[in-house]
Amino acid sequence: MMETLCKRLSACQDAILELYERDSIHLSDHIDHWKHVRLENVLLHKAREMGLQSVNQQAVPSLAVSRSKGHNAIELQLALESLNESSYNTEEWTLQQTSWEQWVTDPKQCFKKGGKTVEVRYDCDKDNTMQYVVWTFVYYWLEGKWYKVSSHVDYNGIYYETQDNEKVYYTQFDRDAKRYGVKGIWDVCMGGKVICFAPVFSPCEVSTPEIVRPLHTSNSSNAQDAGVPTRKRHRQCDPDEGPLDFVHNLQPTTDSSTQCTLHNVAPIVHLKGDKNSLKCLRYRMHKGYSHLFNNVTTTWHWTNNTNSKCGVITFMFSSTSQQKQFLQCAKIPPTISVSSGYMSI
């Protein structure tokens, strides 16, 4: 039995060596390669079970090692067989592109082609850099089908867009910024272009951002449906004003002699734009400037909004003076639109 095992292992390894030397660009050959790798580890696993320390002057790995490598070979063989049944089977595929090492490189369990280097300078320091790979093409599996998409880079990280226009980040720079930097900022350099850190806030001398349109809200249920927090606030008002039927009729006054308490009104600011940009903007505001607002929503959108990429976040303030300070001190990116007003709560 030992002699048979030795012969089969030798024949299997010869076939693997031949496939390496062939340097094929066809999926069928790479599938054959992983079949032989799988068989090789089955034979080595059996040899270890038989108590053998070496076969054909080759050290026999532990049971755990041969089992793990065998499972890896099965995983890649099945992935390549399904890829071979797709429309991408006529493309050229190299041994490296179908290797286990590249299969588990981010984005994991995807095939990748055309790697390019992007450099990130943490703390915007050219002596504190890291290099990452941006793949020209990413092949991902979803619901029984392979899709081919491109990778992109922005300030947040490296991502690809799915067929549903969803961004899937497989590298996020803020995570490494905590490890390699102290300021929480970085520059992204690629192809002669630099994406720099754009501060959320500047000194209060900065002019107020352009107001796109005033916000008029007369029904508290609309705001609640949108996920806006409902907390009572106090503000100044004219005691001669009538019932609060329409919030946009409220005109705050600074006359201390005419103070009254309204329990159902709060100043707010809507920021509207790309969902991922809003998420990063909210994160940076929470991190260092939470004193300039009282509360903030998650990203939300109106139910009749057909633009799936566009979202809104709403900031709530305890007073009109805090709202004014926010608008004066906030440096909102030009891609984000601003709406301010009041909301009944």
Swiss-Prot record:
Q: How is it modified after translation?
A: Phosphorylated.
DNA-binding among the record's keywords? yes
Gene Ontology MF: a single term: DNA binding
Keyword Transcription regulation in the entry? The reply is yes
Q: Which domain of life is it from?
A: Viruses
The record's Gene Ontology cellular component field reads: host cell nucleus
Enumerate the InterPro entries for this protein.
Answer: E2/EBNA1_C_sf (IPR035975), Nucleotide-bd_a/b_plait_sf (IPR012677), Papillomavirus_E2_C (IPR000427), PPV_E2_N (IPR001866), Reg_prot_E2 (IPR033668), Regulatory_protein_E2_N (IPR036050), Regulatory_protein_E2_N_1 (IPR042503), Regulatory_protein_E2_N_2 (IPR042504)
Q: How does it assemble?
A: Binds DNA as homodimer. Interacts with protein E1; this interaction greatly increases E1 DNA-binding activity. Interacts with protein L1; this interaction enhances E2-dependent replication and transcription activation. Interacts with protein L2; this interaction inhibits E2 transcriptional activity but not DNA replication function E2. Interacts with protein E7; this interaction inhibits E7 oncogenic activity. Interacts with host TAF1; this interaction modulates E2-dependent transcriptional regulation. Interacts with host BRD4; this interaction mediates E2 transcriptional activation function.
Give the UniProt family note: Belongs to the papillomaviridae E2 protein family.
* Stated name of the protein: Regulatory protein E2
| Lineage, uppermost ranks | Viruses, Monodnaviria, Shotokuvirae, Cossaviricota, Papovaviricetes
